[in-house]
């Protein structure tokens, strides 16, 4: 029996065995992998989303009730159970992806669907050592990666056959995924964007009511995520509040290109009661960023803001940007904000002090954002545009390959040209299903690049969600007849 003619049953069995060997094998080799941010989820830190912290809490509570409080691989044994559970979840979702592709395109492409997901996982584990992306890592990505695959399958299915049950699954899993990892708001944006294009502009699917249904569900998803987050914090901390520190990354990004004149934006806060002397806080933060050379003027090759060029500067610029961003946030903004709250609001307990510090960050974010938007298309906004477009380019590059060695940048460019050429050929040759799937995958990839590039900085752990799907749909376009 050739692989080409393999039955659905045998295909499912073989791929399930292969996936089990790979992912369970990794758990047995590594045990639970502890990363830099792991402890904050275990501690149910106020800066973290509710979903993953609750999963860890439930496992911990269950094992304590059963009297299983020993260690495995040098960590509490319940973390090994979490790692195994996560790995089984990966197995099930990737197997589901393989079976979905088998259903429409046969065993070869179904096998490639499984292969590309294993390949991405293997690259993360054995070549790139991206610890947070392993199935056995005690990190939100360990659930977000397979959930992103599952949501993509549901979005494919929504346009394969429009069903209420698919919409319900999309809604529920979207809420779950964002509750676990806020970064997955990018999928909600993808869903809304795809629905907008398909239901309003593509003749076969044109149905404005269906777009409105998706839009209502999208808004409802945001409301549910917020309600879950606030209810969780009320149960844990006694206050109805979303997790804090959500604006710091965006402030880091804006501070990287700010000029001395930005201090004047905060002069109105000199006599503010809600944010007393916020102008002094911002001036301190800005001056410290400059003093430590964490701003755009200090990347290698900088001559002047006017001479900045995306074409010539983006590689060195984004490298410097990525190196300094966390330092801007965690060594300047966050401690400065905490010191500010301690000085002007000493009566607040720890929880309310964190809420106040978050409000301070939101206020700074709002002021800087409005100013950046106002000047974005002007001469003064040139540096902002260069950083944004440079980050977006990097996002696209590392979603398909990497920036090092630099030959991979050119290779990724060729791959995108090939992808679009195949996409157009699929449209011209009536391969509608393949073209639709390629469009949805690329939409998710593009939204992730733009949002991540605008809010923080692209790095492989943020960008590889679509990688396996990107190469899968490219192969579907090339191989399917």
Question: What role is predicted for each listed range?
Answer:
Residues 84-107, 150, 154, 422:
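Transmembrane-helix motifs of polytopic, lipid-linked glycan transferases
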Residues 27-73, 77, 242-243, 353-358:
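Extracytoplasmic catalytic/substrate-binding loops of multi-pass membrane glycan-assembly enzymes
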Residues 149-166, 481:
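Membrane-interface transmembrane helices that cradle and orient dolichyl/undecaprenyl
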Residues 95-127, 145-146, 162-169, 439-440:
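Transmembrane-helix signature of polytopic, membrane-embedded enzymes
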Residues 77-89, 346-446:
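Membrane-interface anchor segments at the N-terminal boundary of transmembrane helices
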Residues 167-181, 218-229:
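Membrane-interface alpha helices of multi-pass inner-membrane proteins
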Residues 34-36, 40-42, 218, 222-342:
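Juxtamembrane membrane-water interface segments immediately following transmembrane helices
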Residues 123-155, 177-190, 462-467:
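Multi-pass, polyprenyl lipid-linked donor-dependent membrane glycosyltransferases
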